[in-house]
Each structure stands twice: as C-alpha cells, then as structure tokens.
Amino acid sequence: MSIRAEEISALIKQQIENYQSEIEVSDVGTVIQVGDGIARAHGLDNVMAGELVEFSNGVMGLAQNLEENNVGIIILGPYTEIREGDEVRRTGRIMQVPVGKELIGRVVNPLGQPVDGLGPINTTNTRPIESPAPGVMDRKSVHEPLQTGIKAIDALVPIGRGQRELIIGDRQTGKTAVALDTIINQKDEDMICIYVAIGQKESTVRNVVETLRKHGALEYTIVVTASASQPAPLLYLAPYAGVTMGEEFMYNGKHVLVVYDDLSKQAAAYRELSLLLRRPPGREAYPGDVFYLHSRLLERAAKLSDARGGGSLTALPFIETQAGDVSAYIPTNVISITDGQIFLQSDLFFSGVRPAIDAGTSVSRVGGSAQIKAMSKVSGTLRLDLASYRELEAFAQFGSDLDKATQAKLNRGARTVEVLKQGLHKPLRVEKQVIILYALTRGFLDDIPVVDITRFEEEFHAWLDSNATDLLEEIRTTKKLADDDKFAAAINGFKKVFVASE
C-alpha cells in the first residue's frame, strides 16, 4: 500500500488550517519597593482597584493604591520572601473567601484557611469579600427578637435579628463575655454564629474556642481569627471575611449572628496600612475613609424581606474605649453607624455589678419592636427605676432622714441591681427572665433581704423547673404574660419554702 504525496500534503494543510495558537497574555509588573506588609510595583497599568495579584513566590496581594507610575499592594501573607525586582502578575480576580456549612465548627484565618489542625475544609463555594449591602427594598424592619440570655440586655436594651448593636467599653470590662454568653444562648434557636477575633492574643482565642466547645456552641459557630502576630492586612480583612461567610447563610434564608471583637484594632491596622501607602492622615492620624471602612461592613447586616428569603444577619461590633472616652473618633463613628450601643462601665465592673451595663447610656434604637410582649410589660419601668435609684443613691449618702417613698425607691433599686447581676456563661431562657423580673417589678422581692436576692433567684429557677413547668411553657409559646394570679401563686408558693439568711 503506497501513500501518495498529495494525501500527506492535504492532511498537513488541514492540520495547519485547524491549528489555533493559545497564547496566554497576562499583565506582569516588577516590585520596586517592599516592606511592612506593603509592596509597590511598576508595570501593572491595567490592574483594577481591589484586584488580587500574585508574587513570584506564590504569595497573594491586593491592589489598593492605583498611582500614576506604580501600584500600592497590601501583601496577604509573609512578605519577608519578596524582594525588589521580583515579578508580580495580575490574576483578573477580586478577593474571595470560601463559604458554606463546611466551615461551621472550624477555626479559620481571614483567607478561609483552617488554623485548628483538623484538616482541610471541603468546600468549593466562594463569595467576593467586598459585596454591596442589601438595598432598601430588599430589607424588612427588625421584628424578631435575638435573645442574648442576659437579663440586663434582654430587658433594657433588647436586640432584634438584623440589628447592629455596638458593645463599647474599656478593656477588661467583660465585652467578650457578653458576646460569648449570647452565642451560647443560641443553642436551640437555629442560629449560625460567627466570632471574628481581630488582633487578639492567640491564647485568648484558644480560650474562646474551648469555652464554646465546652458549652456545645462550637457546633453552630465559625471562628475567624487574625491574631496580634499576623500582618496588618489580615487584621484589616478579618471582619469582611466574617460577614461574607455569614451572608452565604443569610441569602439562603437562615439567621446569622456575627461578633467583631474588636473594630478598634481593625481601624488601627487600616491606619497603619494607609500611612504606609502614603495616604494623607486626618483626625487622630486615621485616613479620611475610616468611616466608610466600618459603614460598608456594618451596612451588610440586615433583616431581608420575605421575597429575598427572610434571612437575617445581626452584627455585634466591639469598640474599646480609653478611660471611658466615648467621644473619641472611632467610638463616635461606630455609634453613629449602629442601631444602638451597650456601654460597659469599668466602675460598675469593679464594684461587682456584672455584666457592667450602664443603663443610662445604653440604648437600643430598633430592638423595642422585636421584644416579646411579656418582656416589654415586665421591663417597662426598669430603666426609670434604675435611673432614679442611681440619682437617689448619691443623695442618700449625705443624710439618713429619708421619707418612706424615697426609702422604698432605694430598697427597690438595690434589689433591681442585684437581680440584673448574672454569672459568667450562665445565660437564662427568656421565660425565666420574665418571671423573676415580674417578681421584682411587682414588689414580691421587697421583703427579701438584698444579700439573699441572688440565692433566691437561683433556687426559684430550680423550683420553677420542677413545680411550674406549665407556666414556663405558656410564656415560651404565647410570648405573653400569664394571669397575675398564676404568677402570684408561683412566686408566693416558692417564698413559703425559701429560708432567708439571718
């Protein structure tokens, strides 16, 4: 069998005609300066703001400053291996993080990589780290309660699903404890929690994870950590990574709680990056867009309309103040963005009032409409009682000749302070909160010695579990107050068996 030359040439011609050259074109630049988590590169003329770029050693960066003849890049990883003259190339992608239920129960860094030593996370879903907040028509007003399990919060500054409630106070005033108790209390509430630790010590994060595990809360919680030893870019990105993971659940009709602990450290990291990028400093050396840094993060918390699935994302941002100064730059910014604040006072904390919530300066602007009817009825006068007690307490120190009405107010106030105290990691179901606050505000505790109030409450809750389960169930299901007679019968029934200390 002979092969003819014409056939061979025809085949070759056909192959040449069908050949398509696949030329891969990518923008490549050169590093001209590097240090402190920042690199400047020349030659990336078409790079987009916020685009991911890749250095020759595989470390990723984020294009932040687009200048006339160079690009300022924040480096998302170890920068000590990057040298002047190294190649840096565009990826054409913006930054994304892994999302999905596979992350629940895990501890990850802001890039979504596991740091808990439990192996890889098997998820293929990702979401862009910067995404627009839901629009006005996609939202619904906050109307469902988020029970924190903390009496002082659920009664005085109630939080609703989809709200942004700031927790503000000096260091060591119990801010993290409030958030952890809230997460622990979501156990049977079908809520996914995300705890974002920004600039915390690694030992502190370890303690938080162990606390959550011990109380069975890690099975519905994601922990995102950018510890104090991490470069500033990761501290800056951590809150956005946390809210992005939460949005995946929110847009699928689920309810999410995101805790940012704390945004002061994120603002400091962003200030550091901005100054290194030579952006002009403003008040307290923060850059001009530090307000937008927090507003675009917190606006992503929302209660979605029924048409969008009815999911919600509740944000609890933390701000650390210096000596109680809430009028500093970052505290005032975040107060103006959020829907209320819980102010923790160090004076109260050190005097033994814990949680150290200052009822006078704490406020919830939208939570009232989310509070259950039973709670709003029993807690109606609490704030006024506390405020008048604090005022009278100062006067009472000067003289002992007080009329009966003033004495009664002081007695009621002292008992109110005692009832609102709560142990660490002991969140209380809302129906039990309602009953003890009913007993307080209706005068049933006025004849119990102040020193016995805490013991009375603990024993009363145990007594209710065995003797008044139907009353608890009625409040839980109807969310309304039962008949006064039922309450009085239960409280008086327990008072008969309660033994006051001598």
Swiss-Prot record:
Keyword check for Ion transport: yes
Keyword terms: ATP synthesis, ATP-binding, Cell membrane, CF(1), Hydrogen ion transport, Ion transport, Membrane, Nucleotide-binding, Translocase, Transport
Keyword Phosphoprotein carried by entry: no
Molecular function per GO: ADP binding; ATP binding; proton-transporting ATP synthase activity, rotational mechanism
EC numbers, comma separated: 7.1.2.2
Its membrane topology: Peripheral membrane protein
Pfam family, one: ATP-synt_ab_N
Subcellular location: Cell membrane
Binding site for ATP: G169, D170, R171, Q172, T173, G174, K175, T176
Recorded catalytic activity of this chain's protein: ATP + H2O + 4 H(+)(in) = ADP + phosphate + 5 H(+)(out)
Domain of life: Bacteria
Self-association state and partner proteins as the record states: F-type ATPases have 2 components, CF(1) - the catalytic core - and CF(0) - the membrane proton channel. CF(1) has five subunits: alpha(3), beta(3), gamma(1), delta(1), epsilon(1). CF(0) has three main subunits: a(1), b(2) and c(9-12). The alpha and beta chains form an alternating ring which encloses part of the gamma chain. CF(1) is attached to CF(0) by a central stalk formed by the gamma and epsilon chains, while a peripheral stalk is formed by the delta and b chains.
Protein name per UniProt: ATP synthase subunit alpha
Lineage, broadest ranks: Bacteria, Bacillati, Bacillota, Bacilli, Bacillales
